[in-house]
Curated annotation (Swiss-Prot):
Residues 89-99 are annotated as: Flexible loop. It holds the Pfam family S-AdoMet_synt_C. Its EC number is 2.5.1.6. L-methionine binds at E46, Q89, D249, K280. ATP binds at H5, D164, G165, K166, K240, F241, D249, R255, K256, A272, K276. It comes from the Bacteria. Keywords: ATP-binding, Cytoplasm, Magnesium, Metal-binding, Nucleotide-binding, One-carbon metabolism, Potassium, Transferase. This is S-adenosylmethionine synthase. It comes from Synechococcus sp. (strain ATCC 27144 / PCC 6301 / SAUG 1402/1). It is found in: Cytoplasm.
Length: 406
């Protein structure tokens, strides 16, 4: 899914707001929701911050960055109406986050028991060895295609493309292993005519040919698995995609949670990421789950690993921690669970500190969360993301080996 999809526009505006507020005030509490439609942007939610930021300017700049700069698309950075309707964070929620139950009841004086989870919920993280970045192959390829689609639009290589677009890859599996590319699907917004080509069928033929040469082939150039004569290649199957973006569909923050994660390959707790500061465990704990799962797979202790955490609002310690390797583990899941509890910090305050989640926007020039708001939060080798590090893999491997030898 490209950055010009209506829901992704909303995610990016929400995270641009989050970046700006955390840059100026790292303790900001943010739940920024955005709605877009033809000619309209609504910024709503709850924010408690000392930061002074022009949210309207932020929204317009992000919209322009995605490519909506003209007035002929029904949605442009300079001609859309931007409305703001924000409240402060509820004090009933804030009191549980500011001081966790463990400290309110004087049951713990541990440092990471100071901050409670910002909500209740279940979070999952996943990793597998299907792609170099330890992601499921279908979502990995889909993101690669979407990013390349944006590249050839931004650099003018295919100057008839417009910002909205989706990609999808269907993989054939045998015995749980990817063996073939079954279908590649690209839906991309485009101008009504390409040069002197105005016939709809001829336009689609040109787009299909260009996308194969300049999007698909470059994406697969360094991969072992390749499309072949049996692979179906579908482009704009309706026959036309001129009206797109917020003019074609309304957009809403947090509506593409499967695209943001693992493409449906693993379970999902239902919580979205964008617009949420890291005290919201929907976001920070999902990042921690990915970190744990990726280190287990990187250590060679499993071919597939799913990690589940759950939290209660206002409570610092996870309610549950589970590890599942789907029969691919080199040691028992119970051994892995013990290693996870020993080596990974899973309190909300600990996750925030370990990943530096409140200060990274300021340290990276005001751009951190918005960079993952499109093209996925996981497996991003193009970005330096703390939850994608595999710095604990060696320790896990050594201790797991010692356990089996004992």
């Amino acid at each position: 899914m490209t950055e010009g999809h209506p829901d992704k526009i909303c995610d990016q505006i929400s995270d641009t707001i989050l970046d700006a507020l955390l840059t100026e005030d790292p303790s900001s509490r943010v739940a920024a929701e955005v709605v877009v439609n033809t000619g309209l942007v609504l910024i709503t939610g709850e924010v408690s911050t000392q930061a002074q930021t022009n949210l309207i300017d932020l929204a317009r700049r992000k919209i322009a960055e995605t490519g909506y700069t003209g007035e002929d698309s029904g949605f442009g950075a300079n001609n859309c109406t931007v409305l703001i309707a924000l409240d402060k964070q509820s004090p009933d929620i804030a009191q549980g986050v500011d001081t966790a139950q463990e400290q309110r009841q004087a049951s713990s004086d541990e440092r990471f028991d100071s901050i409670g989870a910002g909500d209740q919920g279940i979070m999952f993280g996943y990793a597998c060895n299907e792609a170099p970045e330890l992601m499921p192959l279908p979502i990995s390829l889909s993101h690669r295609l979407a990013r390349q689609l944006a590249v050839v639009r931004h650099n003018g290589q295919l100057d008839y493309l417009r910002p909205d677009g989706k990609t999808q890859v269907t993989i054939a599996y045998e015995d749980g292993k990817p063996v073939a590319i079954d279908t590649i699907l690209i839906s991309t917004q485009h101008k009504a005519a390409i040069g002197d080509i105005s016939d709809d069928n001829a336009v689609q033929e040109r787009i299909k040919s260009d996308l194969w040469e300049q999007v698909v082939l470059p994406v697969f150039s360094d991969l072992v698995i390749q499309p072949d004569s049996a692979t179906r290649f579908l482009v704009n199957p309706t026959g036309k995609f001129v009206i797109g973006g917020p003019q074609g569909d309304a957009g809403l923050t947090g509506r593409k949670i499967i695209v943001d994660t693992y493409g449906g390959y693993s379970r999902h707790g239902g919580g979205a990421f964008s617009g949420k500061d890291p005290t919201k465990v929907d976001r920070s704990a999902a990042y921690a789950c990915r970190y744990v799962a990726k280190n287990i797979v990187a250590a060679g202790l499993a071919e597939k690993c799913e990690v589940q955490l759950s939290y209660a609002i206002g409570v610092a310690r996870p309610v549950s921690v589970l590890v599942e390797t789907f029969g691919t583990g080199k040691v028992a899941d119970e051994v892995l669970l013990d290693l996870v509890r020993k080596h990974f910090e899973l309190h909300p305050a600990g996750i925030i500190e370990h990943f530096n989640l409140q200060r990274l926007p300021g340290e990276r020039g005001g751009r951190f969360y918005q960079e993952v708001a499109a093209y996925g939060h996981f497996g991003r080798n193009d970005l330096d993301l703390p939850w994608e590090q595999t710095d604990k893999a060696d320790t896990l491997r050594q201790e797991a080996l010692a356990t089996t030898q004992a």
